[in-house]
Swiss-Prot record:
Annotated protein name in UniProt: Cytochrome b6
Organism phylogeny: Eukaryota, Viridiplantae, Streptophyta, Embryophyta, Tracheophyta
Gene: petB
Organism: Populus alba
The entry's keywords: Chloroplast, Electron transport, Heme, Iron, Membrane, Metal-binding, Photosynthesis, Plastid, Thylakoid, Transmembrane, Transmembrane helix, Transport
Predominant location: plastid
GO cellular component: chloroplast thylakoid membrane
Length: 215
């Protein structure tokens, strides 16, 4: 086993990377509230894993979506547990994200030179809220349907571009199959991809600039 490790160590310098990660200075004022961002990341990873598992059974059509969710909850092996964990971690992710934003703001973590870290964090917050809106509709039950109808109807109040924007969100003049397809694509592909991209921007900046000092 040591020979295998030595082979990788010689080529990748694993120990050097590990030492760099574990030797990062942590200021003495850091407490449990500074872990909220990491908890949000953990919830996101749980979301990815459980969401991926449900794609094997979920059917994004207006005629089969609700029945497929029922199948996940009642017949698929551990489906009830996977979906329940997905829902619980979704709520936890939103809560932790909100608390994380408050913690950063109250401790001045948005100030120079961390402005870009703050901006990417705000974008991640918007993406998190978007996950909630798009995911809420996927069971296509009465709650999901009317939630989509209300949310997608909000931009209609905007002068000139309101109606075209509503049609863009819905995929047609009314809520239907095109709307569900759009929301499913956003929830399972577009939003996770954008979230991963902004996380890959967010974390290196935190790593480079370190944790902000006490007020």
């Amino acid at each position: 086993m040591s020979k295998v490790y030595d082979w990788f160590e010689e080529r990748l310098e694993i120990q050097t990377i590990a030492d760099d990660i574990t030797s990062k200075y942590v200021p003495p004022h850091v407490n449990i509230f500074y872990c909220l961002g990491g908890i949000t990341l953990t919830c996101f990873l749980v979301q990815v894993a459980t969401g991926f598992a449900m794609t094997f059974y979920y059917r994004p059509t207006v005629t089969e979506a609700f029945a497929s969710v029922q199948y996940i909850m009642t017949e698929a092996n551990f489906g009830w547990l996977i979906r329940s964990v997905h829902r619980w971690s979704a709520s936890m992710m939103v809560l932790m994200m909100i608390l994380h934003v408050f913690r950063v703001y109250l401790t001045g973590g948005f100030k120079k030179p961390r402005e870009l870290t703050w901006v990417t964090g705000v974008v991640l917050g918007v993406l998190t809220a978007s996950f909630g809106v798009t995911g809420y509709s996927l069971p296509w039950d009465q709650i999901g349907y009317w939630a989509v109808k209300i949310v997608t109807g909000v931009p209609e109040a905007i002068p000139v571009i309101g109606s075209p924007l509503v049609e863009l969100l819905r995929g047609s003049a009314s809520v239907g199959q095109s709307t569900l397809t759009r929301f499913y694509s956003l929830h399972t592909f577009v939003l996770p991809l954008l979230t991963a991209v902004f996380m890959l921007m967010h974390f290196p900046m935190i790593r480079k600039q370190g944790i902000s000092g006490p007020l």
